[in-house]
Regions:
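Carbohydrate-active catalytic/glycan-binding domains of CAZyme proteins
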Residues: 1-443
């Protein structure tokens, strides 16, 4: 490993999953103040006033951080849904909040629903502080069993050309819709449910939810992130992009996210799925992500994830990861949890060595992708699996390409913290010329 001081410092070790001494049942003991367990549907926000980072999650639980590496629980950020929401839904559940600041007002968009039904609504709560408390203002949209969609999982996006504000939302059934908001009130600016911009076929139960749209000023595209599959086992994160906030959103193969002809589960550019490095925790169902384009221009993706257990889904936890961009404008997600690392100039000598690599291949159902060994040699040859006729080269200070047969893999190379082996490392994150994402780390 390189001798240069390029690596992040050792982070605080993650708090262990709380369990009863006997084994399987989750403890009812209060969570450690730095625990990320039970964080679900995390929405990331960097407050320009306090300078602190916040995460808002299902259950109205809040987290706060100075650096996105160490987090502290701050308790409930809002109390109960408004009466008109409760009267419609019949529960006080608060799911999947998302936040936006308009003027001096912080606006939290919360979902009120019960699992597996369409009797749902999204309501707005407001505060003069990022940490709340948020006070309900009113219902934005609601659905019931007679509707073709489900009103949960809100995210707010602004049109960079005209300043109009939109709410993208939806879960299963009729897919993901986008609805214009009244920027003055934060409530709906139009009747109805808006426009469908993504959906899934009936064979997979229409399993799409957790939409999140961000705009990249460098590529001048809006990017729609959403989760496919089941939150309890095979969640995976897909991406499509559009020049217009209203779509159409097309994937890496120019397929529309509303296209129902997807028998092989390949529509949508997959940036994360269940994975396992050797000697590390096997993770499944990364999903319901949010994205942060920070004040310094850096990009991050935040999502919940579970430890592998296909028999009984355990509690979720939260991962924050650096996000980079390919040369043709697609997001690339770090294979390791964020520890404060920055991109630095690297040499070929830094990069030479033994690696584990993971190919994030779409499958039905979406399984856990397991790492395989790879070696990058000083003579610019490489090998992995049964492939020996492989070459590689650095194409920039922190970019690399790997070639074999008719395949070309493009990578970002960056320092990181190896959370499996608990040591500094280099990671590679990239995609091949077929649009399949790849992860790797140096041993």
């Amino acid at each position: 490993m390189t001798e240069k001081n390029i690596f992040p410092k050792e982070p605080m070790k993650p708090i262990e999953k709380p369990v009863h001494p006997g084994g399987n049942n989750i403890s009812n003991e209060p969570l450690h103040k730095n625990s990320l367990w039970f964080t679900h549907d995390p929405a990331i926000y960097h407050d320009p006033v306090s300078g602190k980072y916040y995460v808002y999650g299902t259950g109205a639980d809040g987290l706060c951080s100075d650096d996105m590496v160490t987090w502290e629980r701050i308790g409930k950020i809002t109390d109960v849904p408004p009466k008109d929401a409760f009267d419609h839904v019949g529960t006080n559940h608060i799911w999947a909040p998302d936040i936006v600041k308009v003027g001096e007002e912080y606006r939290l968009y919360c979902s009120n629903s019960s699992f597996g039904v369409q009797q749902s609504c999204i309501y707005l709560a407001v505060s003069d502080k990022a940490q709340g408390p948020f006070i309900p203002r009113g219902v934005v949209v609601k659905t019931d069993a007679n509707c073709h969609l489900n009103a949960i999982d809100a995210n707010i996006i602004e049109d960079v050309d005209n300043g109009k504000q939109y709410m993208v939302y939806g879960s299963f059934w009729g897919g993901i819709h986008i609805l214009e908001l009244d920027k003055q009130t934060g409530l709906a600016a139009e009747e109805g449910f808006g426009k469908c911009i993504a959906r899934r076929p009936r064979w997979c139960d229409g399993a799409i939810e957790g939409p999140y749209i961000i705009y990249n000023p460098d590529t001048q595209y809006y990017y729609l992130f959403c989760s496919y599959g089941s939150l309890s086992c095979d969640y995976n994160i897909r991406v499509a992009r559009s020049k217009s906030v209203l779509g159409p959103y097309l994937d890496h193969n120019n397929r529309d996210m509303t296209d129902l002809d997807d028998t092989d589960n390949t529509i949508g550019y997959m940036v994360a799925c269940g994975y396992a490095f050797h000697e590390g925790t096997e993770y499944m169902a990364p999903g319901h992500n949010s994205v942060l384009h920070d004040f310094d221009g850096e990009w991050y993706i935040v999502h919940h994830v579970r430890e592998k257990n296909f028999k009984k889904a355990g509690p979720s936890t939260m991962h924050v990861r650096k996000m980079y961009w390919s040369k043709d404008g697609w997001p690339l997600v770090s294979p390791e949890i964020y520890a404060g690392e920055k991109l630095v100039s690297l040499t070929e000598n830094d990069v030479v060595g033994h690696y584990e690599r993971i190919r994030l291949t779409p499958t039905i159902p979406q399984g856990i992708q397991v790492s395989t060994a790879m070696e990058l040699r000083a003579d610019h040859t490489a090998c992995f699996g049964i492939l020996t006729q492989v070459t590689w080269e650095m194409t920039g200070d922190n970019t690399m390409v790997l070639r074999y047969s008719n395949i070309e893999e493009e990578y970002q190379v960056a320092p990181a913290w190896d959370y499996e082996l608990w040591k500094p490392t280099l990671v590679i994150t990239g995609k091949d010329n077929k649009g399949i994402c790849l992860w790797g780390k140096k041993l």
